[in-house]
Amino acid sequence: MFDDVNIDDFYKLGFTYSSMLDMIPKKFETYKYTNATNGGGIDIDPQAAKMMRKFQNIIKEHLIQKYFRVEALGYEMWNGVPPDLRLFHNDYFHHKKGYNSNVFIFIDECTDNNMNYIEMRTGLDEFYQVFPNKFDMIWINQSEQFTYKMIHTSGKNRILNFRYYIHGLNNKTNWEM
């Protein structure tokens, strides 16, 4: 599980990814997702919330704890992109949130019809556009030097978001390990 995750990319680029195609139940394609585009509250179906808690623990125990001491801090599921994620930002440093890492799972594939992707900035002139496949997981490092934004142009963009606090995460020293 998560054998294809490249921890060096997490340290140096601010993200890494893995396919969860065989792990995410197809049921997630049938749930109702809150339209996040307007910035309103996020509602989660109780059955989906039960599965989200399980996935949050699986990601914590089988991925993040391989490398870090970590606390799981919550989860959301939405369609579109919340307004505060549309500009380059760092949730921990700019938005003063209590988490410094996210795991996003994309329910919908990025296609020509729905250009939905993440841009990661690792410096002033270095950034990466990450175009997820269906059920891809993208693990975001929110150390001080990394920022990201989400792009949603059209169509469905259903996302599962898991928030974590990783103790001692500071890539300015960690990436040289």
Predicted segments with their positions:
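Intrinsically disordered, low-complexity segments enriched in small/polar residues
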Residues: 8-9, 13-15, 29-31, 73, ...
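Non-heme Fe(II)/2-oxoglutarate
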Residues: 1-71, 85
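Catalytic core of non-heme Fe(II) oxygenases with the double-stranded beta-helix
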Residues: 76-145, 149-151, 155-159, 165-177
